[in-house]
Amino acid sequence: VRYADENVRTKEAKKK
């Protein structure tokens, strides 16, 4: 699930 991992990272980066 690389897509899910990337999505979580992107969501975290946007939250920061």
UniProtKB/Swiss-Prot annotation:
Record-given protein name: Large ribosomal subunit protein uL6
Family designation: Belongs to the universal ribosomal protein uL6 family.
GO MF, one annotated term: rRNA binding
Biological function: This protein binds to the 23S rRNA, and is important in its secondary structure. It is located near the subunit interface in the base of the L7/L12 stalk, and near the tRNA binding site of the peptidyltransferase center.
Top-level division of the source organism's lineage: Bacteria
Record's GO cellular component terms: ribonucleoprotein complex; ribosome
Name of the gene this protein is made from: rplF
Record's subunit section: Part of the 50S ribosomal subunit.
Natural source organism: Vibrio proteolyticus
Keywords: Ribonucleoprotein, Ribosomal protein, RNA-binding, rRNA-binding
Cystine bridges: none
